[in-house]
Amino acid sequence: MPVDKNLRDLEPGIHTDLEGRLTYGGYLRLDQLLSAQQPLSEPAHHDEMLFIIQHQTSELWLKLLAHELRAAIVHLQRDEVWQCRKVLARSKQVLRQLTEQWSVLETLTPSEYMGFRDVLGPSSGFQSLQYRYIEFLLGNKNPQMLQVFAYDPHGQARLREALEAPSLYEEFLRYLARFGHAIPQHYQARDWTAAHVADDSLRPVFERIYENTDRYWREYALCEDLVDVETQFQLWRFRHMRTVMRVIGFKRGTGGSSGVGFLQQALALTFFPELFDVRTSVGVDGRPPQGAPDAAQG
């Protein structure tokens, strides 16, 4: 190996006869992917490329997140706990990636952004179909959001499908009911288009699980997986809001919203409220929760 020349030779087995064969760029369709960054500013503002790539990569991660959450729902429907936990673990890491990449956009200063903001017109991240779709999968359902996508019948139909189907949390509650937990009957069939709100009738179910983790370890582990997902999602929302505040202050959003104020409202929205509420009541009657199971059970 000619290390003294600061290079490495191609190994004999490396494929170089690639004419007409599947290549890295062909498999990933890089010609299409890397030609999709088309700044609208004239002359092209240097920082518009950052803005475009930030949002395009976010949409790719959102596509993967939606893919994993749909799989989690199917696994719950089939009572496949460990498979569900696997995809929820991946979902959490995707959300972490989405959260951390705000640090790249934070390098965009207010003066730099104002150099090309006008070309965005009324376009806004608020119009991200995939983001709304994921919110619906997780249970933050709002039929009003369909109005935003009236210009896109296909996308609107996809969003409506998620609106009218049980969310991840609702499928989790149905899973608990199948395994003997006292889930109210209306969770078997209700108006799935309505957002889930905190329900005191569910608290005893989760108190029982959290105070008897040795007996209900699978249910308990799923609860904590869902808490992880919501926590990371809220961190993403918070980081989004702070990044917007850093870049535009309290200006109105390009999509017509109040901007930071509207994003702050999202931080009050929850997916799995009972899983957080139960933490207040666990063990308050003086009975210590049961410990975790031994290794054979886990």
From Swiss-Prot:
Cofactor note: Binds 1 heme group per subunit.
Binding, heme: H240
Enzyme Commission number(s) of this protein: 1.13.11.11
Binding site for substrate: F51, I52, I53, Q54, H55, Y113, R117, T254
Domain of life: Bacteria
Signal peptide: none
Pathway annotation from the record: Amino-acid degradation; L-tryptophan degradation via kynurenine pathway; L-kynurenine from L-tryptophan: step 1/2
Listed GO biological process terms: L-tryptophan catabolic process to acetyl-CoA; L-tryptophan catabolic process to kynurenine
Keyword Protease included in the entry's annotation: no
Role played: Heme-dependent dioxygenase that catalyzes the oxidative cleavage of the L-tryptophan (L-Trp) pyrrole ring and converts L-tryptophan to N-formyl-L-kynurenine. Catalyzes the oxidative cleavage of the indole moiety.
Family: Belongs to the tryptophan 2,3-dioxygenase family.
Name of this protein: Tryptophan 2,3-dioxygenase
